[in-house]
């Protein structure tokens, strides 16, 4: 049963990466399909993305018009959207929820970088 679950999670990760969804960095490739290792790796990637976004916003907030609560509101919206995956249940739902949050945070980071670039070039 454990091997079946491990194979399923590995296939899920492969499908997510093929489908163009954000997948945790290459560092997560050595997790060997172990759910807890995959989850921790994705959560570490989420933490890195959060730190990068907060640093970009805080260093640019005055010049670029970011409201004080911009990040917290965006992060809450991401979390609420991704919580839908919990309804899937079990380890699969937990993994999908975390992967969703990582993907959406990476999208938010790209959006913020583009916003800053647009303001700089206007």
From Swiss-Prot:
Keywords tagged on the record: Disulfide bond, Signal
Q: Name one GO molecular function term.
A: identical protein binding
Per the record, the gene is tsiV3
Share what the entry says about its subunit structure, partners included. Homodimer; dimerization is critical for inhibitory activity. Forms a heterotetramer with VgrG3 composed of one TsiV3 homodimer and two VgrG3 molecules.
Which Pfam families would you find in this protein's record? TsiV3
Q: Where is the signal peptide?
A: 1-24
* This protein's record includes keyword Signal: yes
Protein's recorded name: Antitoxin protein TsiV3
Does the UniProt entry include the keyword Signal? yes
Disulfide bonding pattern of the chain: 28-41, 82-100
For the null mutant, the annotation states: Deletion mutant is susceptible to killing by V52 strain in a VgrG3-dependent manner.
- Species in which this protein is naturally found: Vibrio cholerae serotype O1 (strain ATCC 39315 / El Tor Inaba N16961)
Q: What is the lineage of its organism?
A: Bacteria, Pseudomonadati, Pseudomonadota, Gammaproteobacteria, Vibrionales
The role this protein plays is: Immunity protein that plays a role in preventing early activation of toxin VgrG3.
Top-rank taxon, per record: Bacteria
Q: What is the effect of changing residue 91 to A?
A: Greatly reduces VgrG3 binding affinity
For this protein, the record's InterPro entries field holds: TsiV3 (IPR049347), TsiV3_sf (IPR049348)
């Amino acid at each position: 049963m454990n091997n079946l679950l491990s194979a399923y999670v590995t296939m899920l990760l492969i499908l997510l990466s093929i489908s163009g969804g954000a997948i945790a960095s290459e560092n997560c490739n050595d997790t060997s399909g172990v759910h807890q290792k995959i989850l921790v790796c994705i959560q570490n990637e989420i933490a890195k993305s959060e730190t990068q976004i907060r640093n970009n916003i805080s260093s640019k907030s005055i010049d670029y018009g970011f409201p004080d609560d911009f990040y917290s509101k965006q992060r809450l919206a991401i979390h609420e959207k991704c919580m839908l995956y919990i309804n899937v249940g079990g380890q699969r739902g937990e993994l999908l929820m975390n992967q969703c949050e990582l993907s959406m945070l990476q999208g938010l980071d790209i959006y913020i970088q583009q916003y800053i670039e647009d303001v700089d070039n206007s």
